[in-house]
């Protein structure tokens, strides 16, 4: 009763059914808030001013628009606050968008590696289909590991044991 899920596609999101399935499984109140108007409006205004957005702008803008949306919704809810979903593995390598997905009043998963987050979800009874989906920013069409150029397993080995994968070290 104290949790509100906010699904924020930027136009059409191919895996929105996954997100819908998760909020339905959790039984939480939720909104589907399409941020395309916000991101499109900013890009249109940049074009009007003769500005060409960089690749980083187009990749990070939806994440920042999502955070603006979350804060607008939270401030419109009774005692609403925004939590971020960053985890230790992402934080360790800086895999986030500043003032985007890394923003929130606190980070309940911030002390856990990706593997520990999956184990926590399993312990809490989440179905396997919600645990095995390859992490993706949902923006570039690539997995997190494709974007990073190394695996979360390699990050986690370093974070928890100080062991560096020789392939990553090169």
Describe the predicted segments one by one:
Residues 154-162:
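Short alpha-helical "packing" element that flanks the helix-turn-helix/winged-helix DNA-binding module
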């Amino acid at each position: 009763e104290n949790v509100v899920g906010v699904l924020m596609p930027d136009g059409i999101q191919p895996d929105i059914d996954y997100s819908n399935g998760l909020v339905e499984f959790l039984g939480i109140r939720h909104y589907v808030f399409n941020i395309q108007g916000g991101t499109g409006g900013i890009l249109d205004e940049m074009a009007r001013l003769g500005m060409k957005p960089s690749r980083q702008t187009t990749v990070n803008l939806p994440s920042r628009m999502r955070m603006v949306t979350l804060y607008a919704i939270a401030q419109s809810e009774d005692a609403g606050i925004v939590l971020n979903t960053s985890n230790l593995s992402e934080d360790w390598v800086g895999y986030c968008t500043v003032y985007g997905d890394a923003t929130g009043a606190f980070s309940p998963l911030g002390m856990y590696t990706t593997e520990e987050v999956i184990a926590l979800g399993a312990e809490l009874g989440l179905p396997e289909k919600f645990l095995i989906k390859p992490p993706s920013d949902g923006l570039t069409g690539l997995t997190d590991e494709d974007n990073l150029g190394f695996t979360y397993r390699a990050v986690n080995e370093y974070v928890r044991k100080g062991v560096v994968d020789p392939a990553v070290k090169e």
